[in-house]
Amino acid sequence: MATNTPTEPGGDLALLGLMQLVSPALPIGAFAWSQGLESAFELGWVNNEAELAQWIEGVLEDGLSRCELPLLARLQTAWANDDGATIAHWNQWLHATRETAELSDEDTRLGGALKTLLGNLNLLPDQTLIPAEPGYITLFAWAAQVRRVPVRQTLLGFAWAWLENQLAVACKALPLGHTAAQRIIEQLRPALVNATDQALARQDHELGPILPGLALGSALHETQYSRLFRS
């Protein structure tokens, strides 16, 4: 059970806690996964800076804003209310949206790594509230809640970390220059805000990713001859 929760919701400690959570130095192995992006390079779907920005923005709009981000908001609220049934429901729902073995494996392994880290930091919640196979989103929501991060900031932080990871993949595998990556960040910062706004406004019946291309790329990645990343 966590014992060192900050007392000021949304204060400096919360901000620093969020920065820790979204840091690429967080030892959970997120750098090893590309979420199908490496396959998009291999298949010739994404070949340059402009196409990469278009791909990332599409995944943000049709994926994160419809799935990960709204679920993150729901899960953080459920953690705040110690609502184990709702936590279990959305954790299971999230697993069901992972359309390939690699995407499912990524979510489960990152969730397991984050659980281990939180345990080492004495930040785990009541064991009875943790699902048997907690996904990454589920425990990210808890880690933000225990730090008293406001929900909107949690979503923005998660989206930022996801964007940085996608660009890190591109810098290694496309390859993309670091200055080009910064141009994409400048271009897509408003899209992160827009995706967060959309996620917070979505009703339950509006949830679910619409990413057939990403799912196909992820499936093909399983048999890709030469790979740098695990998804």
Curated annotation (Swiss-Prot):
As for subcellular location, the record says: Cytoplasm
Pfam families in alphabetical order: UreF (PF01730)
Identify a single GO molecular function assigned to this protein.
nickel cation binding
Task: Please provide, in alphabetical order, the Gene Ontology terms of the cellular component aspect for this entry.
Answer: cytoplasm
Q: Which UniProt keywords apply?
A: Chaperone, Cytoplasm, Nickel insertion
**Family under the similarity heading:** Belongs to the UreF family.
Chain's role: Required for maturation of urease via the functional incorporation of the urease nickel metallocenter.
Assembly state and interactors? Answer: UreD, UreF and UreG form a complex that acts as a GTP-hydrolysis-dependent molecular chaperone, activating the urease apoprotein by helping to assemble the nickel containing metallocenter of UreC. The UreE protein probably delivers the nickel.
Q: What is this protein called?
A: Urease accessory protein UreF
Question: From what organism does this protein derive?
Answer: Marinobacter nauticus (strain ATCC 700491 / DSM 11845 / VT8) (Marinobacter aquaeolei)
